[in-house]
Amino acid sequence: MTKVAVLGSGSWGTAFANVVADAGIAETVLWGRRPEIVEAINTKHENPDYLPGITLNPRLTATTDVAEAMAGADFTVIAVPAQTLRTNLAAWSEALDPGTVVVSLMKGIEVGTCLRMSEVIAEVLELPDHRIAVLSGPNLAREIAERQPATAVVACTDEQTAVRLQHLCKSPYFRPYTNTDVIGVELGGAVKNVIALAVGVAVGMGFGDNAKAALITRGLAETVRLAVALGADEHTLAGLAGLGDLVATCSSPLSRNRTFGEKLGSGMTVDEVIAETKQTAEGVKSSTSILELARAHGVEMPITEAVVAMMYHGLPPAEALLAFMSRSAKPERYGV
């Protein structure tokens, strides 16, 4: 029987492991650091800290032993905070099954290197492209854990590998599509977090749907510009991993990035938001790396630039809005 190991027992790791268990094709093992969460999953079929009140598939088992989880896994799915990936991979590398395909559920760009998550995996584990896949799309973890209808994109340069993973996680409520454009799929997932911060700020300032629509649309434009400059297919960004993920993340109160931005827009400082939420949204962490990539490739990303200025340079949201709205007038067409 095919085995899928999911490393990371947070909300998304747990929800995706449950999707695979519900699909019923593979043995599914979830690894987590915290013994109390692992015990709750195994005995009560619930992750009380991250997905309280949701009953998980009893076929899903959990362990604190990463070597046990990874042993013989055909697919090793990673769902940890993006900026911890490199450190975790170094610790796990010796337990990696020689034939496993490593799958990233993470949506971020590594600070310091500006590498996508699949690039970090390739570098640390020295794996070829056909053994690395990514899964992305409009995937709010709690909705999926509640078994509400959802879609996603499985991307790998080797289409057959993507198809194999697609079959393992297809269920009555979860419909994955395949793609070979790993660059486009990953960038769509990473940049949308930054745009969601901007949308959240606008909501926090009391602005309405016109402002949100403008930020989402122009945010998509700058995402496409960067992705194409890095070798992606622009059509990927019109799909689930681009527009779909962007709309979900910018629209939902379940989105950590939108929520973070909303609190900032309502008058809180970045430090106050971090203290209240006890976490830093991934878009905050990745925004500087995304802006570095943009500048290195001569890509204009005014919304991302404004987000970085607010998050790291203390620019008040009202001034960021003024700077954005005061830019020189341009025609609306691709690449401008």
UniProtKB/Swiss-Prot annotation:
EC numbers on record: 1.1.1.94
Binding site for sn-glycerol 3-phosphate: K107, G137, K192, D245, S255, R256, N257
The protein's annotated pathway: Membrane lipid metabolism; glycerophospholipid metabolism
Residues reported to bind NADPH: S11, W12, R33, R34, K107, A141, R256, E282
Catalytic reactions of this protein: sn-glycerol 3-phosphate + NAD(+) = dihydroxyacetone phosphate + NADH + H(+); sn-glycerol 3-phosphate + NADP(+) = dihydroxyacetone phosphate + NADPH + H(+)
Stored Pfam families: NAD_Gly3P_dh_C, NAD_Gly3P_dh_N
Class in the EC hierarchy, top level: oxidoreductase
Catalytic residue list: K192 (proton acceptor)
Keywords of the record: Cytoplasm, Lipid biosynthesis, Lipid metabolism, NAD, NADP, Nucleotide-binding, Oxidoreductase, Phospholipid biosynthesis, Phospholipid metabolism
InterPro entries: 6-PGluconate_DH-like_C_sf (IPR008927), 6PGD_dom2 (IPR013328), G3P_DH_NAD-dep (IPR006168), G3P_DH_NAD-dep_C (IPR006109), G3P_DH_NAD-dep_N (IPR011128), NAD(P)-bd_dom_sf (IPR036291)
Main location: cytoplasm
Recorded family membership: Belongs to the NAD-dependent glycerol-3-phosphate dehydrogenase family.
Name of the protein: Glycerol-3-phosphate dehydrogenase [NAD(P)+]
Gene of this entry: gpsA
